[in-house]
Every structure is written in structure tokens, then in C-alpha cells.
Amino acid sequence: GTALAMEHNGDVYSCDHYVYPRYQLGNILNRSLGEMVNSEFQRAFGKAKADTLPRYCRECEVRHLCHGECPKHRFLRTPDGDPGLNYLCRAYKRFFNHSAPAMQRMAALLRIGRAPAEIMRQAA
């Protein structure tokens, strides 16, 4: 619940996929962004996002990367038959598992004080 959306007129919403009157947190012209992010409504929005994840997602090895993604995209069933699986789940898993070795190499470079961009020379 921390990726808010702001419209051109300053209206702020819980998420860019929920730009509906029900999810309007306020307007940046008359309410601080901090107030909106930390509002009870927004905290409940974020909590519901986590609380509605099916067990398949809660036990997933890449959940820390996608967090179940957007609730609007959770319209498939898990292999166990539970509702709430993100329709991009399989692609996310493939991407994160494919890119993990490169991410780990970049993290190792950072730990020794080198630029992660050096990985580009290693890949060439």
C-alpha cells in the first residue's frame, strides 16, 4: 500500500489500478502525502493486499520480489485450486529465476565496492 497514484489535478489514490472515487485519499494541494500514505484507509488497503494472498503465493520462493503483485491481476486459480493467483505469476517466476544469478553477481560487486555496471563487461 505505498505505491500511490497522483493525477494531474493533485488527486491521490491508493494505487494506479484503483483510480476510483472510493480509493481517493485526498488531494496534494490540501493534504500532505505523508498523511495520505499513513492514513488508516491506506494501511488497510496495503494489509488487505497481503492478507488475500493464497497459500501458494505466501509459500512462493519469489514472493519477496513480486509480493503477489496487484490484486486486480489476481484472477486465476492456483495449482491447488485456490482463487487469487496473478495471471503473470508464471512469467514473473521465470524472469526472477533467470535474472537471479546476474543480480547476485551485481550484489557481490557492490559488496566489494565496485560498480554493478561492471557486469556488462563480464557478460560481453
Show the residue positions of the predicted features.
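A C-terminal junction/extension of Radical SAM enzymes
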Residues: 1-21, 53, 65, 114-124
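Local cysteine-cluster metal-coordination motifs and their immediate loop/turn environment
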Residues: 14-17, 53-73, 90-91
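C-terminal accessory region of radical SAM enzymes
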Residues: 17-61
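A generic structural signal for secondary-structure junctions
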Residues: 30, 38-41, 71, 75, ...
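Short Fe-S-cluster ligation motifs
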Residues: 45, 83-124
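Short cysteine/histidine-rich zinc-coordinating motifs and their immediately flanking basic loops
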Residues: 69-75, 80-82, 100-104
